[in-house]
Amino acid sequence: MLKDLIIKSVMLSLLLIHLNQGLHGQDNLTKPNEILVNKITSLDGMISLWKFSEDPGKERRASGKGEFPLKESNGMVPRINEGPLSGYSILLDGTKHLTLSHSETGLLNIYGDRNEVTVIAWIKWTGEQTGFVGGMWNEYKDGGKRQYGLFISLPHYNGRDQVCGHISRTGKPTPPFPYSIDYSASGQKVPANEWCTVAFTYDGKYIKSYLNGVFEAREPELINNTAGFEGYPNGLVQSKNPYYFPDGMGNNGSDFTVGSVLLKSGMGNFFKGQIGGLAVYDRALTENELKTICYLK
């Protein structure tokens, strides 16, 4: 009887390993994962998927509804022989980023009262600092050209070490505060130095942040750095996940960037770590859909 139990236990373990690889990824991060890539590209609404398999010095091109070639900025961006999609990833050291000029954004320029968006990325973050992963976000030029963007760790308004999804209608800070406060922040912390899947969705009403395909709601809470402003003597109380934002996205003229955004002081909010894939959809994916395209070790 004990022998039968051992055999059944081993068989169950092998089955779970097989299912995990089939649904989410593979343990060998140095080879292309076509199963996962096919799942990503088969979902309706995909505009672009960058797998970052190109050599340093080359434009990083997407598959989908356009190539959207991302150019290196401030030097060559190294390629690492490790990644959950193509077997490769870009390594960002906190000084470099990739960029696509606004005139070339095309279908990536998502805006409107009821339009939706999903940004999802497969990353290994160092855990050191605020990092912009990707989107159309510019905090300085002409008063700000914010639109949509995926960040890791925005501590000023209760998003430290969390997946943050930023949306803006006006492109400018949120009155009466000095910065834009309109972002969701996941209930979970993003692990440092570990491959994971980070995403946010916006359905025209709510912004939601996900870690590894899982949405964790947050109860209403007092938001840091909001007390003493006009209308908020004791500070603002709100939920960060989901974040209520019915205003829609503005057509604000930002470039599409990966790894950094333009601040008053120049490029900043540099992502440090590896990015093995980045995808944009023109609709809000469901939690079940996001779970099917996560990489879980």
Residues of each region from the PLM?
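Bacterial Sec-dependent N-terminal signal peptides
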Residues: 1-30
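Extracellular glycan-associated modules
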Residues: 26-74, 80-297
